[in-house]
Every structure is written in structure tokens, then in C-alpha cells.
Amino acid sequence: NDTEDSTHVRLEGNHGAASNAGITLIGYSGCGKSASLEILLSNYPQVIIHKSESFQRFPQIVYLVVVCPANSNFSALYISIGEEIDKALGNLEPVYEQMVKRARTVGEKANVICKLIEMFAIGCIIFDEIQLLDFSGQKESTYESLLTVVNKTKVAIMAVGTEDAYSKMFPNLRMSRRTGAFIEANAYC
């Protein structure tokens, strides 16, 4: 089912009953988490170009890898997602990064990200070095705001980081259950 506007096609599906998919990969620094991920992702195209019956082309982003900025908040993280969308699409200008930057609050940035996830039917967003994020702050600017994006869009998320990230990300059991499977990479080093 496609809904068209003047410049984009929005892919829609029946994801109302879909459960959140996700995975958390935690391990020692330098144990090969990011390298393993690179090898895995090299087997998949990052973008698939679909063609409609009228020969209109529209991209679907299979996955994004977002390296979390050091000592940053969720506003910076959402801007990084916009930047990675531009890179995946091969944009020479930071179109989607600027779109996210123009949103004033973290909540508005999250809403822009939701629209972009739906517009490009993004399958999975991988957050590497997630321990670098500042998880303190108000509810709107915490990991819970990211989970709200996940709940709205049903995009799968993968969090990759060191053991420090686990206690920051999951202050309670309810939060850890919402992100899916947990893999302790130390067992494979």
C-alpha cells in the first residue's frame, strides 16, 4: 500500500500487531563487536531501490549504522541518524541531517526521525559505541524517548557497546525487556 505526496512515496504496512525486534551486543572494548558487525552487514545491501508500475524509483534503507557521538545527548543522536540517512542515500548535501537539526526540541527531532523511518522503510538502526551517550536527563531526552520511536515505527534496533552501557541503558528490567535479545560478546573473545 503506497501513499504518494509530491516528492516521496511512503511505504505502509500492517505493523500494528508487530512486536519490537531488537538486540543488544555488549562486550569488552576491543573484543571485535564492531568488526563482527561489519562482516555481517557486508552480506546485505544497505539500500534497495524499488520501482513502481509507473517506473518511479524509491529507496528502502535496509539498515543504518550510527556511531554514537562522544559525550552526546539524544538530540545529537537524532541528528546523527539524519546524517547516516544522507550517507546511505548518497546525498551530497545534508538534506535529512538539516531536517532533523531544524526541529527545536528532542521530541520534535524524534518525530522527524519517525517520519524518515517510515518514508524510507528503514529495517534496522544499529547504534555502535552506545556507552558514549549521556543517559541522564529528563524522560524526553533519555533512552526511553528512543524506545518511543521504536514503538511508533516498529523499526528494529541494535545497541552495541561496552559493559558500562548496559547499566546506563537499562536502569530497570522493564527497559531491558523492550530491546530484545542480549548477547554477551565476551563469551566469544
Language-model region placement:
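Conserved catalytic segments around the Walker B and adjacent sensor/switch elements
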Residues: 48-69
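Mid-core helix/loop region of P-loop NTP-binding domains shared across ATPases and GTPases
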Residues: 6-8, 14-19, 58, 73-80, ...
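Switch/connector loops and helix/strand junctions flanking conserved nucleotide-binding motifs
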Residues: 33-34, 73-75, 165-169
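The catalytic "switch" region of P-loop NTPases
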Residues: 119, 123, 134, 144-189
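Residue-level preference for the first positions of well-ordered beta-strands
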Residues: 20-24, 63, 124
